Amino acid sequence: MTALKKAGLLRTYYRDRLRGYRLGAKAKLVLLDGWPERFTFCLTGDAETNRLKSEANRRFRLHRLAETYITIGNAGVLLYPDEKPKVFAQTGFGGEAVTYPVFYSSREVKELGADATQIRSSRFAGVLLAPTGIFVTYNSGGALMKWRYKSELRVKTLLWNILCQQRLAQQYRVEQVHGLVLGDSMDLAYQILTSTGGAKHDYFMLDGSYDHFYFLTNDHQGEVILALLCDPVKTAELDRILSQGLSAGNPGSAMEQDAAEPDGTPVLFGYFCDLPRIVRFNTALELMERPGTLICFDFQADVLRHYCGDRVHLQTIDFTKFEGRLFP
């Protein structure tokens, strides 16, 4: 940072007792001269990201977006416009399939033009397209984010129409659109699991907008699990390892489960922290007054144990050993 500031590429900005860094004109020219196909999109014309955003809430929003890009980029997902198909462009999309994990920011999605006017009030950071599905991505930071059910449902509906029924209809089905929320720590996962939306019902809660809503942390552990979420082959290998000594779950059962203990105790693979699925599993166990087993990573265990209580037995996966085996 010091070297960039001395070179005149970064400048410090203070307002409302918050310090930030901004690209100087020299830095923008360097990026545009060196990689025009990558940075013209966001550094020229009347681009939204080229405007100064000095209000505290807008600066925090930009920080969360930048944090999202770092987490997703470190998971091996492609981010830059020149690396991916122009799926959301009004013109220029050639109908090519998405064969690798790619992320489109909310601003890129809004390139659709008139079709995107209905989602302007959404809190989503962008959309992750992976072989395993479409993930509408949010970053809640360290606390519950503001949430408007109808606004977020419009995002889901737009993706159904544009991706599942039009541009990528051969690749994705409507049931493959899921939610993904990033947070600073697993403590936020507990807040989400127990949230009722606040007094005005305007904070994030599991309101049924997505049947599957994954929670990942903005750290190395979250990055590795995100890479796993995008990789169906490695996910299948982990499931195979976890299934050793277990029998197949009952697909006809009303209870959410992935396997069963030899004595019939239902088992859920909860390592992706699919929060609605964990809620459904725990609720079913309570209604049936029976025990269950939840398998998760070691760093997720305390929060999930706190939420599920004594009825659920937790088995943990050593994250370090897992990473060494599947992501050496």
Predicted regions and their residues:
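A short, polar/proline- and glycine-enriched secondary-structure boundary/capping micro-motif
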Residues: 31-35, 42, 146-150, 280-281
